[in-house]
Regions:
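Mature catalytic domains of secreted/periplasmic carbohydrate-active enzymes
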Residues: 1-176
Length: 176
């Protein structure tokens, strides 16, 4: 709604962040509306959503702000239903659903969620036509612990069992 509606149904912060990552990976912009009440205040649910989104952006914003699409926009099994009022056909993302952005000497690999399992990145295998760089740093934003990675002919395997999130997770690959 473009204004306050008492019976409004809200997306979760997870859904909004997944939409944001998907849109930015396609070089798009997300328009997020907050409908104020007549007195100018916003309801508690909207404050909660904005706070959760802001906390995620504080950690992962470098993969969003001033980035552009990488050679590969997306990998994964989940079909994204696009267009206005498409929420009814929305399917949950899983850890095979990965988006990519890049900036400067970094590529950001962004699984839409991660539950402790290995992440398989098909477009970053040793034989990939899309990724030829030398990796100088491999990290996961928001964690001090470093993930492990291994490149095989047809894929990169990211091993980070300490990462568990139903929201997008950002791996930063610095390269030369």
């Amino acid at each position: 709604s473009w204004c306050y509606t008492a019976q409004n149904r809200f997306k979760t912060s997870k859904d909004i962040l997944q939409d944001l990552v998907d849109i930015v990976s396609k070089n798009g912009c997300l328009l997020l509306n907050v409908g104020p009440k007549a007195d100018g205040t916003i309801c508690e649910e909207e404050v909660k959503l904005l706070t959760e989104i802001g906390e995620w952006m504080d950690v992962n914003g470098e993969a969003i702000y001033d980035t552009h699409p990488w050679r590969v926009q997306a990998e994964g099994n989940t079909e994204v239903v696009e267009g206005m009022f498409s929420e009814e056909g929305r399917k949950d993302f899983d850890s095979t659903d990965i988006r990519f952005t890049c900036k400067g000497d970094c590529i950001y690999v962004i699984p839409m969620k991660q539950e402790g399992e290995d992440i398989i990145v098909k477009s970053m295998g040793e034989d990939s036509k899309d990724f030829h760089a030398i990796i100088t740093e491999f990290s996961v934003l928001g964690y001090e612990e470093r993930p492990e990675y291994k490149r095989e002919a047809d894929k990169m395997i990211i091993h980070a069992p300490f990462v568990k999130s139903d929201k997008p997770v950002v791996y930063r690959i610095r390269m030369k």
